[in-house]
Swiss-Prot record:
Cofactors (names): Mg(2+)
Description of how the protein assembles with itself and partners: Homodimer.
Protein name per the record: Anthranilate phosphoribosyltransferase
Keyword field: Amino-acid biosynthesis, Aromatic amino acid biosynthesis, Glycosyltransferase, Magnesium, Metal-binding, Transferase, Tryptophan biosynthesis
Gene name of the record: trpD
Binding site for anthranilate 1: 82, 113
GO cellular component: a single term: cytosol
Family, as annotated: Belongs to the anthranilate phosphoribosyltransferase family.
Residue positions binding 5-phospho-alpha-D-ribose 1-diphosphate: 82, 85-86, 92-95, 110-118, 122
Cited Gene3D superfamilies: Nucleoside phosphorylase/phosphoribosyltransferase catalytic domain (3.40.1030.10), Transferase, Pyrimidine Nucleoside Phosphorylase, Chain C (1.20.970.10)
Function summary: Catalyzes the transfer of the phosphoribosyl group of 5-phosphorylribose-1-pyrophosphate (PRPP) to anthranilate to yield N-(5'-phosphoribosyl)-anthranilate (PRA).
Listed SUPFAM superfamilies: Nucleoside phosphorylase/phosphoribosyltransferase catalytic domain, Nucleoside phosphorylase/phosphoribosyltransferase N-terminal domain
Positions contributing to Mg(2+) 2 binding: 227-228
Length: 349
């Protein structure tokens, strides 16, 4: 099916089959569709509502065409990632959580990009922390294997997505492409914590991940609108485990974390985000640092749980709390910074 035929279906409110969506996605990623057609597809799918089959097929094609790193043999391999688009400008919780998860003994292959709606995307923050993202595939694999944490800068792995950059920027709306980033980790990861911008997406995205072969996934959205597990409200969760999707609601008190407002956790830029994260992960914390540490523990605990290192989410949060207060996560961040700098210096000599 070509993109014009697909648009005709979509305007009639007809969902595309997986085979049809795969055809359309390939035409986009091979440069055969015009920017007007891509924009129309984005808007049409958004207005109709993207189906599980459409999202699955688009993600499968993106995975197929990605420049991959194969570290799928590593035990406890996990990604923690969000769609963005919540507009809250919170400090970068998922990136901070990555260092906690890695310090706990799991391996992080974090797929990320620059800020979508926040002022500090994962790549913005990491560069601010002195972590070199300008690494080739072999160097990135070394980070993952030797340091237990590596960052996969999305544009380096999904070069064919360049054809959608213009329409996405010009339209400025949430679209299927916001959903695809978290679903298309190029490192063979099968265990995920995925934050989404609407609770209505939790179960569908869990079902998509099931079709894509994931093993254990928590898809989360908080009642106060975050694509994270929130410190300030209930969080809706769809969990894929043992081939089944279950839905549940989490209150922070369920895992011995007191509910607190998000005041003090909003940041202006990546520099402010990094400062808050270092406060939260350090041995001595300010009052706001303590609050940020609790927020990180809630999310890192999910990553530890889905990785297989903890048998329950509650146990994962307790382990994350111990790691944060022991200072190992901040040490992991510092070591990765030095390692990536050394890799680049070695390559340049």
């Amino acid at each position: 099916m070509n993109i014009q035929q697909a648009l005709n279906h979509i305007t009639k409110n007809i969902h595309l089959t997986q085979a049809q969506m795969e055809d359309v996605m390939r035409s986009i990623m091979q440069g055969e569709a015009t920017e007007a057609q891509i924009g129309a597809l984005m808007m049409g799918l958004r207005m109709k509502g993207e189906s599980i089959d459409e999202i699955t097929a688009a993600a499968r094609v993106m995975r197929e065409l990605a420049i991959k790193i194969d570290v799928s043999d590593i035990q406890y391999l996990v990604d923690i990632v969000g769609t963005g688009g919540d507009g809250q400008n919170l400090f970068n919780v998922s990136t901070a959580s990555s260092f906690v998860i890695a310090a706990a003994g799991a391996t992080i292959a974090k797929h990320g990009n620059r800020g979508v709606s926040s002022k500090s995307g994962s790549s913005d923050l990491l560069e601010q922390a002195g972590i070199n993202l300008d690494l080739d595939m072999q160097q990135t694999e070394r980070c993952i294997r030797e340091m237990g944490v590596g960052f996969l800068f999305a544009p380096n792995h999904h070069k064919a997505m360049k054809y959608a950059v213009g329409p996405r920027r010009e339209l400025g709306i949430r679209s299927i492409f916001n959903l695809l980033g978290p679903l298309t980790n190029p490192a063979g990861v099968k265990r995920f914590v995925i934050g989404v911008f609407s609770d209505e997406l939790c179960r569908p995205i869990a079902e998509v991940m099931k079709q894509l072969g994931a093993e254990h996934v928590m898809v989360v959205h908080s009642k106060d609108g975050l694509d994270e597990i929130s410190l300030a409200s209930q969080t809706y969760i769809a969990e894929l485990k043992n081939g089944e999707v279950t839905e549940w609601v989490l209150n922070p008190e369920d895992v011995n974390i007191p509910s607190q407002t998000l005041s003090g956790l909003i940041v202006e830029d990546s520099n402010a985000s990094l400062k808050l994260i270092k406060d939260a992960l350090g041995r001595k914390k300010s009052d706001i640092g303590e609050k940020a540490a609790n927020m990180i523990a809630l999310n890192a605990g999910a990553g530890i749980y889905v990785s297989g290192l903890a048998t329950s989410y509650k146990q994962g949060v307790a382990l994350a709390h111990d790691i944060i207060y022991g200072g190992q996560a901040l040490e992991k961040m510092s070591i990765l910074s030095e390692f990536t700098k050394a890799l680049k210096e070695y390559a340049n000599n």
